[in-house]
Amino acid sequence: MPVPLAPYPTPPAPALAPSYNTPPANGSTSGQSQLVCSGCRNLLMYPVGATSVCCAVCNAVTAVPPPGTEMAQLVCGGCHTLLMYIRGATSVQCSCCHTVNLALEANQVAHVNCGNCMMLLMYQYGARSVKCAVCNFVTSVGGSTSTTDSKFNN
């Protein structure tokens, strides 16, 4: 005679993490701020006034920048990881791939569409041309209209 099987017990409902609204531009939300873990690159929330934060995922301790420090972001050119750094720094080393990235202020860069594939390109202000990383087309920028665009045969 078959024995009736009882259903698996339902696991207890996990405690719900507090829901956070999107933090304002300054990175604080009701007495909390956020930073990126120096070990695993996860976003960490911490109380205002803390001097360091221990990541619950990788246990790395990340120092909290002093109050009033403006932060900026860039994408690593080596591994495409989002990096946060103190505004005004000239270079930022990626903690994942160790690539040293040039950090330019917003007023030091300009944008132009590639003359071949129309990809939006960013270049250092004052440059005469910019090479597209997608199609290798070189687009002339600046005041000179006598220069022509060309393709590199790489």
From Swiss-Prot:
Highest taxon of source: Eukaryota
InterPro entries per the UniProt record, alphabetical: LSD1-like, Znf_LSD1
Keyword match Transferase: no
Coiled coil: none
One Pfam family linked to the record: zf-LSD1
Localization: Nucleus
Putative zinc finger 3 as annotated region, ranges: 111-141
Region described as Putative zinc finger 1: spans on this chain: 34-64
GO molecular function term, any single one: DNA binding
Region named Putative zinc finger 2: 73-103
Assigned GO CC terms: nucleus
Main location: nucleus
Nucleus in keyword set: yes
Keywords for the protein's UniProt record, in alphabetical order: Apoptosis, Hypersensitive response, Nucleus, Plant defense
Entry's Gene Ontology BP terms: defense response to other organism; plant-type hypersensitive response; positive regulation of plant-type hypersensitive response; positive regulation of programmed cell death; regulation of removal of superoxide radicals
Note: Over-expression of LOL1 induces cell death.
Entry function: Positive regulator of reactive oxygen-induced cell death. May be involved in the repression of the copper/zinc superoxide dismutase CSD1 and CSD2 that detoxify accumulating superoxide before the reactive oxygen species (ROS) can trigger a cell death cascade. LSD1 and LOL1 have antagonistic effects on CSD1 and CSD2 accumulation to regulate oxidative stress-induced cell death.
Identification of the protein by name: Protein LOL1
Native source organism of the sequence: Arabidopsis thaliana
Protein's gene: LOL1
